[in-house]
C-alpha cells in the first residue's frame, strides 16, 4: 500500500499571470477561457510519484502587488510555492522577486521549496521577460525554473510534480549542514 502524503502548495504572483489557469488545467484538464479575478480558491488532486501518493492541496491566491501583505495562511502549514509571472509582463516578473523576499522574511529560512514559473509562453511574440532571466533568478534562489502555457497545457503536470520534488529536496537538506553532539 502506498504511503499517502499531504502537501499544501500556494500559487502566488501578480494579477492576470495565469495562476488559476495553471491550477485548473492541472486538476480539471481544461483551459479556462474567461477571466474572473480570484479572491482565493482551492484545488485538490492526488498524484502518484514512485511508490508514494501525494494529496496536493493547491491554494490559488488573488493577485499580489508590491505592497501586498502576505497573510500567515500563505506561510503557516504551506509546504511549497509556485511563484508565477507572465512572460509578456516585466512588472509581473518584478513582483515575483518581491514575493520571494516576503516569503523568506515570513518563514525565516534561507531555503524555501519554490518553483519559479514563467507562464503564457505561447505568447512569446509579445515577450518582455526572456527565459534566461527567469532561469538566472531561480538559480539565485536555489530554485527550479520552468516556462509553461496553461492554454496549451505545456508542462503543467511537470510543474506540480516538480514542486513535490522541491519540497522533498528542501526537507531532506535541513540538518545536513548542522553538526551537533547530544550529551
From Swiss-Prot:
Keyword hit for Ubl conjugation: no
Gene Ontology cellular-component terms listed: cytoplasm; endomembrane system; plasma membrane
Subcellular localization, as worded in the UniProt entry: Endomembrane system; Cytoplasm
Family annotation (SUPFAM superfamilies): P-loop containing nucleoside triphosphate hydrolases
Catalysed reactions, semicolon-separated: GTP + H2O = GDP + phosphate + H(+)
Main location as per UniProt: membrane
Transmembrane segments: none
Organism domain of life: Eukaryota
Keywords of this entry: Cytoplasm, GTP-binding, Hydrolase, Lipoprotein, Magnesium, Membrane, Metal-binding, Methylation, Nucleotide-binding, Prenylation
The protein's enzyme class: hydrolase
UniProt-annotated binding residues for Mg(2+): 38
Assembly notes: Interacts with MTOR.
Family membership noted in the UniProt record: Belongs to the small GTPase superfamily. Rheb family.
Protein name per the record: GTPase RhebL1
Annotated organism of origin: Rattus norvegicus
Amino acid at each position: 500500500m502506498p504511503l499517502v502524503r499531504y502537501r499544501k502548495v500556494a500559487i502566488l504572483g501578480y494579477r492576470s499571470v495565469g495562476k488559476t489557469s495553471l491550477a485548473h488545467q492541472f486538476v480539471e484538464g481544461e483551459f479556462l477561457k474567461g477571466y474572473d479575478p480570484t479572491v482565493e480558491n482551492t484545488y485538490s488532486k492526488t498524484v502518484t510519484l514512485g511508490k508514494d501518493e501525494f494529496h496536493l492541496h493547491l491554494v490559488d491566491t488573488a493577485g499580489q502587488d508590491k505592497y501586498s501583505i502576505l497573510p500567515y495562511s500563505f506561510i503557516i502549514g504551506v509546504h511549497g510555492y509556485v511563484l508565477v509571472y507572465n512572460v509578456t509582463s516585466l512588472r509581473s516578473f518584478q513582483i515575483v522577486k518581491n514575493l520571494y523576499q516576503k516569503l523568506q522574511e515570513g518563514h525565516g529560512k534561507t531555503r524555501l521549496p519554490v518553483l519559479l514559473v514563467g507562464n503564457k509562453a505561447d505568447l512569446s511574440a509579445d515577450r518582455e521577460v526572456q527565459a534566461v532571466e527567469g532561469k538566472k533568478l531561480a538559480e539565485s534562489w536555489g530554485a527550479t525554473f520552468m516556462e509553461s502555457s496553461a492554454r496549451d497545457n505545456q508542462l503543467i503536470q511537470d510543474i506540480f510534480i516538480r514542486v513535490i520534488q522541491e519540497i522533498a529536496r528542501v526537507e531532506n537538506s535541513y540538518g545536513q549542514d548542522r553538526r551537533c553532539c547530544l550529551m
